[in-house]
Amino acid sequence: DFIIVHESGHEWFGNSITTKDVADMWVHEGFTNYSETIFTTCEYGKEAGNDYVIGTRKRIQNDKPIQGPYGVNQEGSGDMYYKGGNLVHTIRQIINNDSSFRMLLRGMNKTFYHQTVTGKQIEEYISKTSGIDFSKVFDQYVRTTQIPVLEYKVKGNKLSYRWTNCVKGFNMPLKINFGGEKWISPTQKWKTLKIKKGNINTFSADRNFYINTKPL
């Protein structure tokens, strides 16, 4: 039963690590929601875990940001559960090393053991520990309701792509499949990649990233 796993997960996020303001409650619920995915992965395998977290996206409403306003005792959107879990899953993909991701979670719980923290402290810890600047990723998924859109087009042997529907400076790397797996680093400006000639319909973005795609 997922609720048993979820509430057990709060021993780490929401009990051991607790936010100073309920505006940052996404830290409690996002990471605890993701404990359900970790449990599913341990019991049934990685693809089952991926299926689980991706399956929760249909419950995300994007009605308001998952970070609430500070100093007024107000939470963010209830999306903090499923969107928060998908944010953590996306971060895991970008780190691209499950051992490092596991060490990050354990290190976070050692560093902030039995403390009250801010969401910003958690964000900065993840960036510093991973060696990857996640600031724009957090700005996008925590403080807006927009889901990034990767626009792309193929002409001859060139694939062009860019991010839209995103915060200024959004530069999240992305794994794609177009005649094989590749990593690209889109920005809001068009970039071009030389490829073998192929049908645009064979292009796909890795489903584990919480994004939308739009062929042009």
Describe the residue ranges of each PLM region:
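Zinc-dependent metallopeptidase catalytic helix centered on the HExxH motif
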Residues: D1-N50
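Active-site-adjacent bridging/hinge elements
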Residues: H6-E11, T56-P69
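Short, solvent-exposed loop/turn segments at the edges of secondary structure
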Residues: V27-E29, Q61, Y82-N86
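Short helix/loop segments within enzyme catalytic domains
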Residues: F39-Q61, S100-M103
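Active-site-adjacent structural elements in folded domains
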Residues: Q67-G76, N109
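Amphipathic alpha-helical substructures
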Residues: S77-L159
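Beta-strand-rich binding/interaction modules
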Residues: F134-S135, L150, V154-R207
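Edge beta-strands of extracellular beta-sandwich domains
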Residues: D206-L216
